Amino acid sequence: MTRAKTLHFLQNYAVLILIALLVVALTLLSDSFLTGRNLLNILNQNAPLAIMAAAMTLVISVGGFDLSVGAIFAMGSVTSAWLAVNVDPYLGLLLAPFVGLALGYANGLAITVLRVHSFLATIATALIFKGIAVAVSDGRLISARIDDFTWLGRGKFLGVFNSVWVMVLFALVLTFLLTRTTFGRRVFAVGGNEEA
């Protein structure tokens, strides 16, 4: 393998190689790391982050930045938990995605209509959204220990956490959209040349 090919390979697969090395090291250091229970816990704990990262694929593919994704997640979570405790758990579950959608739409308007660079727009909205989330929660954890509300994160199907199933479904749908639809081709086209 030539030096150029080696560099190209490392650029494309460096993250996967590092993850593999980390898994090997952790397996050698701990007998309990490479167990089904631990791996399921890792997947469950990282499912929300993986879903956000998958969604960020769309933003990055069109050549944008979204630094407010964490704040939007916080707003959706706080809204959902507050509604679950004070109004109705199902209303909390139903409205959380729409909160995220509305805030993301506001970002999109700031970027496309007001022509604010995505980096600056999302830094500003991140501060605003995070401030609202802290104000609504009064800076404290909102504990929603309601069975009808917590089944999505703590419940299991076929021995696997429901959140992991949601993550896998989300990844499959997004992969299909990006690789097999006109929408996906347009996303990559905009990322290649916004003016076109």
Kindly give the residue locations of the regions a language model identified.
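Membrane-helix/interface signature in polytopic inner-membrane proteins
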Residues: 173-196
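Alpha-helical transmembrane segments within multi-pass membrane transporters and channels
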Residues: 87-126, 169-172
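Single transmembrane alpha-helix segments in multi-pass membrane proteins
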Residues: 24-86, 109-116
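Transmembrane alpha-helical segments of polytopic membrane transport and secretion proteins
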Residues: 1-14, 34
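Structural signal for alpha-helical transmembrane segments and their membrane-water exit/capping regions
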Residues: 18-35, 62, 133-137, 176-182
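Hydrophobic mid-bilayer segments of alpha-helices in multi-pass membrane transport proteins
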Residues: 13-22, 164-169, 190
